Swiss-Prot record:
It catalyses: a lipid A disaccharide + ATP = a lipid IVA + ADP + H(+). GO terms for biological process: lipid A biosynthetic process; lipopolysaccharide core region biosynthetic process. Transfers the gamma-phosphate of ATP to the 4'-position of a tetraacyldisaccharide 1-phosphate intermediate (termed DS-1-P) to form tetraacyldisaccharide 1,4'-bis-phosphate (lipid IVA). GO terms for cellular component: plasma membrane. It comes from Burkholderia pseudomallei (strain 1710b). It comes from the Bacteria. Keywords: ATP-binding, Kinase, Lipid A biosynthesis, Lipid biosynthesis, Lipid metabolism, Nucleotide-binding, Transferase. ATP binds at residues 68-75. InterPro entries: LpxK (IPR003758), P-loop_NTPase (IPR027417). This is Tetraacyldisaccharide 4'-kinase. NCBIfam families: lpxK. The gene is lpxK. Belongs to the LpxK family. One of its GO terms (molecular function) is tetraacyldisaccharide 4'-kinase activity.
Length: 342
């Protein structure tokens, strides 16, 4: 296996660690963070004061995003929110930028879409929810195209896009993991895209260590729990994680916060060797061909990039389910219904 994926992952991990403290590197980059913050504040002000117009696409939009760099659990949150909205009587659709997707115009994503076209997260959302999913770097164009193709959709969930201010939205949900805002600095000195004080309608904190929630308004715990693993070659074959306990197991993840996946497996009684791959790793070739393990556990997000041509009988996929606080669902539904009746 090439050393490049490992080097990239280690570089990402080191930068993430640096962003958790105010060390020499953070202070050296602080002037650039000030410049970044000024530009970001000017962009926000341009839309807040009407210098630039927000676009209302004729359907309420719920944005699920973050103010930090890296994975926080947005994708399972979007999947759970789509299911909750459907249960509440809505007909939801989803839009996404489609990170890594090779598209310039609005494109529909179905369960059969190639990951190179759709992007890994939109493809996973389409497969898990069976809701209409459209991707485009221009989210306004994506919402409009979705609405034309599916006029029955009465609410759109935007997977990320918090900083896509041009798109008018009815509800904003910001997702954090246990690191919260790190050292509190903006990019590149810290992990923040926007200040922690940024206005939003609700905050979710995905903290597997079950610490006290920060004292922010309308803040709720986000719980992610693994399900039974399914076999990559034979998806109908299921195996509880506890049954991997006596095997030689490698856990590999090409996601924004791979350590969270590894911690989930350890909590389930699995003691794997671990390999962090770069976020959105393409899996152009099998990186496990020279590894000697009984089983290899990967995430669902990575699994969508492994097509039927993969024939590695050791690979199992670990699904993750998000449990949303009923109070969050009630808050979102109330805002949506209030907007509809207004």
């Amino acid at each position: 296996m090439s050393a490049r994926p490992g080097l990239l992952a280690r570089a990402e991990a080191r930068l993430t660690r640096e962003w958790q403290r105010r060390g020499a590197l953070a202070w050296a980059l602080a002037p650039f963070a000030c410049a970044f913050g000024a530009i970001a504040a000017l962009r926000r002000a341009a839309y807040a004061r009407g210098w630039k117009a927000r676009v209302d696409c004729g359907v309420p939009v719920v944005v699920v995003g973050n103010v930090t760099v890296g994975g926080t659990g947005k994708t399972p949150t979007v999947i759970a929110l789509v299911d909750a909205l459907r249960a509440a009587g809505f007909t939801p659709g989803v839009v996404s930028r489609g990170y890594g997707a090779k598209i310039a115009a609005p494109t529909a994503v179905t369960a059969a879409s190639p990951p190179q076209q759709a992007g890994d997260e939109p493809l996973l959302i389409a497969r898990r929810t069976l809701a209409p999913v459209w991707v485009c770097p221009d989210r306004v164009a994506a919402v409009r195209a979705l609405k034309v193709a599916h006029p029955e959709v009465d609410v759109v969930v935007s997977d990320d896009g918090l900083q896509h201010y041009r798109l008018a939205r009815a509800v904003e949900i910001v997702v954090f993991d246990h690191r919260l805002g790190g050292n509190g600095f903006l990019l590149p000195a810290g992990p923040l895209r926007e200040p922690l004080s940024r206005r939003r309608d609700a905050t979710l904190v995905n903290d597997p260590y079950s610490r006290a929630l920060p004292p922010w308004p309308d803040t709720f715990a986000l719980s992610l729990a693994p399900g039974d693993a399914w076999h990559l070659d034979r998806p109908s074959r299921r195996k509880p994680l506890a049954q991997f306990a006596g095997e030689r197991v490698l856990a590999a993840a090409g996601i924004g916060a791979p350590e969270r996946f590894f911690a989930t497996l350890r909590a389930a009684g699995v003691a794997p060797a671990t390999r962090a791959l770069p976020d959105h790793y393409a899996f152009a070739t099998n990186p496990f061909v020279d590894d000697h393990f009984d089983a290899i556990l990967i995430t669902e997000k990575d699994a969508v990039k492994l097509g039927t041509s993969w024939r590695d009988a050791r690979i199992w996929v670990v699904p993750v389910e998000a449990a949303l606080d009923p109070r969050l669902i009630a808050l979102v539904v109330e805002k949506l219904r209030g907007r509809t009746s207004a």
